[in-house]
């Protein structure tokens, strides 16, 4: 697998409408290898092994899920406790468990532009007040509906338990103990890849109500027309939460993501960080195929055996995954939204896994 990393990066980069720049990395007991190809921005600045990327929804696992994993390992929460114990006044059904939110089964809206919410006086509403005012979209614990809003609530819970702003809580619980020096919330400077040019995708979502009906009237928004480098792509994270949220906002390098994922892939060797019974719960698939607590699951082939990978994609073209109990970790970083017709992150991830020899043919 280590020898295939360069081929995997090139396979993703050379797809028709593939990303401008790609970094692929893998870590196993035999070592770690990272390969970079392409450009970090429209000017052609080369992407390097240590280039930081806006990892978008990978933040849900790198920041929020791992913080909850650590808090549960420390005995500061139980995964089946109700969210209202820590964040009162939500619209979640009474008794809705932390684990239910982590499985995206709380019935919340998938997304709403919270920065458009207004008070009765016409002032911008506090985003947490706006979130608490939204009705449920679905019956609670009925089915999975992937929700940014649920992870915004979970990030708020981490703040309430730790008494710290989320960026400091994630640093204290995750990035500092693991030595992830290049991982954290923005804004960031230095060698950072552009994530997109402007806010066009989100503008179109609001204008059309696709894929989700928008519950707020359109307002005056200072849309960004420029190349987004070092400031978060996600509109709610940028405008409503000043770049720090439970659902998005983290910037990271391939090396840091591999270090985190390898720690989790060999969690039994890191019981000071990850309590075994908590780790088993976090990685266990729930009622919905492909969904664990925070993490997603998928079959892969490893050493001729079918194994389960836990992983998570990000809208900007990034992903991280690991095979529990094996020490195997994989990451893909790209700036797919810089392409005129961006390919889905899932396709980029599948292409990388196939080139690495991890694809499970029976799953196709």
Regions found by a protein language model. Name each.
Residues 1, 5, 55, 59, ...:
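Hydrophobic (often cysteine-bearing) scaffold residues that line and stabilize catalytic clefts
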Residues 9, 24, 30, 60, ...:
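Residue-level preference for non-acidic, small/hydrophobic
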Residues 9-47, 79, 112-120, 295, ...:
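A short, well-structured edge-of-sheet supersecondary motif
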Residues 15-23, 43-101, 137-149, 245-248, ...:
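Short active-site loop at a secondary-structure junction
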Residues 38, 286-323:
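Short, Gly/Ser/Thr-enriched beta-strand-loop segments that form substrate-interacting elements
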Residues 94-304:
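Short, surface-exposed loop or secondary-structure junction motifs
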Residues 243-251, 309-321, 334-340:
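Glycine-rich phosphate/pyrophosphate-binding beta-alpha loops
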Residues 266, 276-283, 340-364:
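Short, gly/Ser/Thr-rich active-site loops of penicillin-recognizing serine hydrolases
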